[in-house]
Amino acid sequence: MCGIVGYVGDRQAAEFLLDGLSKLEYRGYDSAGIAVYDGEKICVEKSVGRLAALREQIKGHVPMGTLGIGHTRWATHGRPSDVNAHPHTDCHGDFAIVHNGIIENYLSLKEDLAAKGHVFKSETDTEVVVHLLEEVYSGDFIAAVREVLHRIEGSYALVFMSRRHPDMLLCTKQDNPLIIGLGEGENFIASDIPAIIARTRRTYILGDGELAVVRKDSVEVMDRSGAPVSKKIFEVTWNAEAAEKGGYEHFMLKEIHDQPKAVRDTMSQRITSGKKAISFEELGWDAAYLNSFNKIYIVACGTAYHAGLVGKYYIEKLARVLVEVDVASEFRYRDPIVDEKTLLIVVSQSGETSDTLAALKESKRRGAKTLAITNVVGSSIAREADQVVYTWAGPEIAVASTKAYTTQLVLFFMLSLYMAEIKETIAPEHTAELVTRLQEIPSQISEILSDVDPIKTFAKQYGFNEDVFYIGRGLDYAVSLEGALKLKEISYIHAEAYAAGELKHGTLALIVEGVPVIALATQRNVYEKTLSNIKEVKARDAVVIGIAAVGDTELQKYVDHVMHVPASDEFIMPILSVIPLQLLAYYAAITRGCDVDKPRNLAKSVTVE
């Protein structure tokens, strides 16, 4: 969620702070601010609204100095306002901080500090931290920050600056991401790689409980007791251009069109010509390992949860193992049966989703073996899990996930085949056929993307409806959920997905004349059943848009429009049928004039509970 940047070096800090924050806009925010030490005092500028408002506010009097911090805020404590925006300062302007997370014991701390004479200007939990720093400071900046960390409770990424110590920034984290970019005669701090990738690819990934002292020519990392921590440099492999729009109007459209390459890269080096068709060298599983589990949980949030629903189908059908899928925020609190015979698979594009990370930690505590599927190397979830497999989708900037989702499906399918081969629950010839179908996916996605005009037409025709329903059975139902989520999150149309067989159990009451129903009918084993459900909504004068495989001539008899996707095996169809749904959501949002990449009230990475 909130974006954090920091700079110490010889160049003007404000230039980097504003540019870095612009690269973090995808995380979602409602206000922005920077603080720069000008040689005498800490100059703070902040504004509610978009970053452009802050730029306009400081036009002609940009704070000058080579030490600074910046922040884009997502309101949790206190409404969006100039005074609640970060950075926050203490009573005398000696310190400034930026923060992502939640300080859980801020109220008791605030009462104590107020009783000692501290005056608070904002409604935020963050301001308590900077006043606490002022209270405990006695000349040693590092010791004071360490004392603050002993007193606060919660999740956080924090960056501290002091006009009394203008050669350094201090930063620390607990359950929220923070990285340090290593430059030449300058160093950077950020909550995510896009903020610094144009300046350096060499980074330290800060661990929970670690405190870094960042100067222009050095970085020292210690634990909370002050003991030195040795850090390994992580080299970012993608470049700044990968995080740019590349000529597309929006990041989301670019990322939709990135999918053939993203899928190809995710499959790369995992398809072999050896005895086993699928290889995950990073896992090294065998039959004894897989047979040691009596249950598998897939735990995720949002789009990743929808990918998990497809993953459940793949694993159960191919590897013949019982799988449960849970929303991470629910899994954490229902006291699930987790022990040493449990395999927990967590899915997160960013690798920083707070509820998913918490579920992972709790399951490990109970003895489960854990596997992470994520898109970000070195992320918190990747580091916490026992094992990790990556979707090589490249940076995904738009809030609405597209290429991360399709690569998650591809990875789940390959993982299921890998498990099935080990357990010998699939015939070699069937594996070979499925691998052939798998390798066709990139070109089939390209085929769908080559003709989007019919989808644009549907978006214009139905983009101003207030309700849209999605129906499907089996794998089609899982994809329906993702299609509805895409439409609602970027076009703000009320969209809901239902298992087609559940229509009679209440949903039919919502079907009235002219309401659009998007019906997925790609699964042959439930095809006739789905047709009967389509007839039910047509009988109530719904406008039905069908999703079917090329060559399906039956469906068009019962629907108003058809969007065709290339024909393939039932396992592959979810990866293909979601593409027109992504495009439909995108063009509906364009039709309605919505901010596609940064929809209201949403953030890319949900790093607070």
Which sequence ranges carry the predicted segments?
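Conserved short alpha-helical segments that host acidic/polar catalytic motifs at enzyme active sites
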Residues: 1-249, 261-294, 333, 428, ...
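Hydrophobic alpha-helical scaffolding
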Residues: 7-10, 99, 119, 134-138, ...
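Glycine-rich oxoanion-binding loops at beta->alpha junctions
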Residues: 66, 70-83, 274-287, 311-347, ...
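Acidic/histidine-rich
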Residues: 152-186, 463-489, 526, 531
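Active-site phosphate/pyrophosphate-binding segments
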Residues: 259-263, 267-297, 377, 387-516, ...
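Glycine-rich phosphate-binding loops that contact phosphosugars or nucleotide phosphates
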Residues: 291-433, 437-440, 522-566, 584, ...
